[in-house]
Amino acid sequence: MAELILALDLPRGADALRLLDELPALRWVKVGPILMTREGPDFVRTLTERGLKVFLDLKWHDIPNTVAGAVTAAREIGAAMATLHTLGGRAMLEGAAVAAGGDLALIGVTVLTSHEASGYARAVGRERVNIPREVERQALVAAEAGLQGVVCSPHEVSLLRRRLGPELQIVVPGIRRRSDPATDQSRVATAKDAVANGATHLVVGRPIIEAANPAAAFEEFMEETQCSGC
């Protein structure tokens, strides 16, 4: 079983709230840079007042003091979970963990799902990269620094679950139905596969938001996330 997080990848808060009115069973939402920049912290408060848990996906990567301050601010506005880049370094991660104080789950971003091996190698200035090993390396750093979990693609879930044990939260974007296009994410899978491999949270956006019937699409994904015997 896993939690389903709806990515509110919409241009305006009003659009997101209209969509949420159609999904009364939803428990988790993801707020990313677009909505946060346009709507601000009050939008997060609006969501929490509706009883929703907010996954603040801003992927912080800055000097330790700045990131610790951002973590404190996220905790104060009621976010339940937030992301930061594992490549920010041990000092940044450890400082963030202290600032979270146990009230905010910190999730380390490893290799973005938009990357495939050759593109990631170019991005980091290497001749070649083994993405699963890179994800594993970054996840180990995150866990050792005191973070509660990591973000990875569906392709690395089983590796991290075996390597890091049952306690680590594994948040997985790139979740699609078999009939859905992958769009700009290159490492994708179905909800059923991700749950079977040990994911704890699944992030779904466009397959629900852009569906002809978002409520029906949401229920379809919910059935797969609750499939403990997958």
Located regions from the model:
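Structural preference for beta-strand elements that scaffold enzyme active sites
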Residues: E3-A7, W28-K30, K53-F55, A80-M81, ...
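Conserved, mostly hydrophobic/aromatic
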Residues: L6, V29, K59, A82, ...
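Glycine- and other small-residue-rich loops at beta-strand/loop junctions that grip anionic moieties
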Residues: L8-D9, G32-M36, L84-H85, G149-V150, ...
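Conserved alpha/beta-domain cores
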Residues: L8-V54, P64-A70, L140, P154, ...
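Structural motif
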Residues: L26, R50, I77, A145, ...
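Conserved anion-binding
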Residues: D62, T66-G149, S153-S158, R163-V171, ...
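Glycine-rich phosphate-binding active-site loops on the catalytic face of alpha/beta enzymes
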Residues: I77-G89, R176-R177, D184-A217
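C-terminal helical cap(s) of enzyme catalytic domains, especially alpha/beta-barrels
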Residues: L93-A99, V195, I208-C230
